[in-house]
Amino acid sequence: MTLTACQKDEVSPSAGATSQTITVSIPQGVQTRAAAADFGDGSQIDRCLLQIYRNGQPYGEQQTATVTGNTATFNLRLVAQQKYDFVFWADCSEAGYETDDLSAITLGSDADYTGNDDKFDAFFLCKKDYTVTESFSETFTLRRPFGQLNVKTLDLAAIPDNAADLKPAKVKVNFTSLPNTFNALTGEESGEAAVEYTADVLNATGELTVDYIWAPVEQATLADFKMTFLDAAGKEISANSDFKSIPIRRNYRTMAVSYTHLRAHETGAYL
């Protein structure tokens, strides 16, 4: 997936300063969320942030650009013959990410994470050691810092129609420990925290949940979690605690398949 961003930087002209334009773009897809395949299209991304670094320190204020028509653009004025790091973060402004420091992005204390909510999707890029020699116009592609975890059950059809009360309407998900901080400057996740939420199941075909989880590029975050199946009133039907060491890798979709007492998984690229 790609991203583009835009904002004017009111810097007084100075000797050696040249003008630059950086664009980031996100393809927009369908707005419905009827199936797991509909998640991750980037359609809820509405802002892009840019922090410029020089010699490892922030250079000027963080800038914000509105994503409109899949694109946003930053108009800059930087001193030539210098190297800069460009750090981008693009998200849905309603998600509640704490982004004052792009080297320590977390979900804010007032934000409650839940699965099956695409507003928690996000993109980033760190373009390091970019030497500004003259005016330029660049387009950069952003990537997700997450792996996407999908959970599906395959035994709903085994429940007879006259036992509809045994078909889950909601699920409670308990992750034992997940990364909770992301450094967009280094591209590394860190920290750990238990995560719990309750959400309506995605649909009646057995697709249950979709989660965005901080994950590394090469090796995988190993997720342990329990899923409790609930009826519409929140009463427990059954539970599955057998989700152990599920590998979550950045920019990949992992499908965890649940039966009454079993689970399996498969992983495949989704970007």
Q: Which residues does each PLM region occupy?
A:
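C-terminal motif of bacterial Sec signal peptides marking the signal peptidase cleavage site
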Residues: T4-A5
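Short, low-hydrophobicity acidic/polar segments
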Residues: Q20-Q148, A157
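A surface/extracellular/periplasmic glyco- and lipid-processing/surface-interacting theme
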Residues: T133-T176, N180
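Conserved small/polar residues in nucleotide/adenosyl-binding loops
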Residues: T260-T267
